[in-house]
Structure formats: C-alpha cells, structure tokens
C-alpha cells in the first residue's frame, strides 16, 4: 500500500510539474540523444562508432565464438563433441530445446540486432553530417556500415530462416531493420530479406569503389605517421574486396 501511495504521489507531482512548465519540459534533451549528437559532431566520432561495431562483432555472442568456432561450427559438424557434459554436446546432436541452447540463440539474436541498430545510426548520421565527413570519409564509413548491416542480417537469415527454395522463400522469418525507430519491425520473407541484403551490398560497393584506399594503395599495413589510422589497416575492415566477394 505504501508503494502504491508513493507511485500515486509521484504521478500527481509529475502532472502538476507538467502544467507548471510544460514548454521547458518538452525542450529537455534526453541524455542518450545528447550523447549521440556529441559523438557524431566530428569525424573522429564516426571512427569511434564504427570501431565500436567491430568490437561488438568480436564478442562471444557473435563472431568472437558463437558464429565462428563455437556453437555454429559444432552444429555444422566441424567438431565431434563426444562427452555429454560438454557445453556444446546438444548442438552436435542438433538438439536445441534446452534452456541453455535457447538462451544462447536468444543472446545471439539480441546482440546481432543491437549491433544492426548501431549500424543504422551510423548510416543515418552519415547522411545528416556530411559536413564533417570530407573527401572519402562519407563513402567509406557509410559503405562499411551498410555492408556490416547486410552481413549481420544474412547470418540471422542463415540461422533463423528456412532452407531456401521456391516453396520456402515466401515464408516470414526475420525482420530486416533499416531505421533507428524504437518500433518492432515486421517479419519478412526470406526472399525479401535476401533482396535487402543484396541491395545494401550493391550500395555499399558503389560507395566503397569511390572511397576505399585499398583499391589504390592496398591495405596500408602500417601506422600513419601522424597517428590517424582511419584509412590504414584495411585488411581488418569490411573493405571493398570483402564486400565484392
């Protein structure tokens, strides 16, 4: 009862405050939005955001383990897991109904779409802040973000979509998220998802063709003398050739 009274009092206080200073309250900038605007206020912010995406790709939920030499490879029968006490034993037997298995797939899904959301923010901000992305940087950053978005959606389709054929391709399976809205995106058919993947890759390829230094200077496998390595070590990025492959 005390908790209920507290909630009611807080609600009344907020209501009175809104009547007292509605205009000021509406003009308050949320902290996450403020941080976002500050991050993308210069080119270095875009570098940090894109680096953050690559760092998240390396977590255990994604390519640091589960989507490479972890559960996925065991499911693909690359490894033989004979001991029933092994954490990946059920994956080798194609049994995914246990709580641990469900949790792994759930974490994989959530992490993947969280990273996709970061890619979408970068793509959106590239268009909004072209003024701080001179020369090749606009095409380079937007191209990489588009390619990363396509790659992640393709892996989600491989995991959670149907075996692709003329019959199954129309079945709804996963969303293809291209915006930063906090709304639930609808499930799309495997056919539409693949069309979206190809569309993103084509756009990324066109952007990187005009901006990626890997085409003219190679991977630039050394540090820049002035300490700015944004255009160096291209072998560690989703570069033009990686997208084209």
Show the residue positions of the predicted features:
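Conserved, well-structured interaction surfaces
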Residues: 86-160, 187-192, 206-208
């Amino acid at each position: 009862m005390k908790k209920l009274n507290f909630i009611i009092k807080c609600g009344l206080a907020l209501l009175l405050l809104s009547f007292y200073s509605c205009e000021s309250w509406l003009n308050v900038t949320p902290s996450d939005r403020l941080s976002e605007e500050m991050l993308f206020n210069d080119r270095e912010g875009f570098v940090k955001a894109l680096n953050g995406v690559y760092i998240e790709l390396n977590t255990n939920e994604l390519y640091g383990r589960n989507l490479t030499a972890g559960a996925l490879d065991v499911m693909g029968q690359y490894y033989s897991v004979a001991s029933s006490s092994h954490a990946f034993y059920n994956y080798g037997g194609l049994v995914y109904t246990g709580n641990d298995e469900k949790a792994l797939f759930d974490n994989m899904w959530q992490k993947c779409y969280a990273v996709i959301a970061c890619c979408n923010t970068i793509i959106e901000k590239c268009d909004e802040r072209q003024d701080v992305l001179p020369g090749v940087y606009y095409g380079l950053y937007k191209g990489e973000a588009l390619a990363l978005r396509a790659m992640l959606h393709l892996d989600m389709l491989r995991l959670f979509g149907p075996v692709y054929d003329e019959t199954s391709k129309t079945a709804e399976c996963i969303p293809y998220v291209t915006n930063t809205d906090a709304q639930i995106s609808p499930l799309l058919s495997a056919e539409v998802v693949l069309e979206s993947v190809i569309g993103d890759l084509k756009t990324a390829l066109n952007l990187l063709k005009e901006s990626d230094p890997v085409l003219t200077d190679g991977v630039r496998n050394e540090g820049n003398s002035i300490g700015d390595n944004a255009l160096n070590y291209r072998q560690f990025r989703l570069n033009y050739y990686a997208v084209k492959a």
